[in-house]
Amino acid sequence: MRRLLPLLFVLAACSTAEAPPADLLDRAKFKQVLLGAQLVEARLNQEMVIEHRTDNPVEVYYTDLFKKEDVTREQFERTYRFYTEHPAEMKAIYEELIVELDSLKENVVDQPVVPK
């Protein structure tokens, strides 16, 4: 019996991934909103560091993001919490986001500069 107990723990740890609860955003939608959140954070960083902006429009930007994506803050936060409790799945999502962000960056860098 003592030898079987560690084996049971290993088997339990290797079981199939838990499906997200029904009230969460689906993976594709969550990834899209998370991409938008990364762009919001980049914009805020740009405004604060480069433009020395003193007001803090973070709530406005996130409200606009959630409205554009047709999700609520609560849906996003519940889904985010779920994936933080499933780090392997969250890591996979972030790896996909990095690819998408790199693609967006390349598209911006390749744009011709328009004189003012």
Residue ranges, per PLM feature:
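Bacterial signal peptide processing site
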Residues: S15-E18
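Compact alpha-helical subdomains of small soluble proteins
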Residues: M48-K116
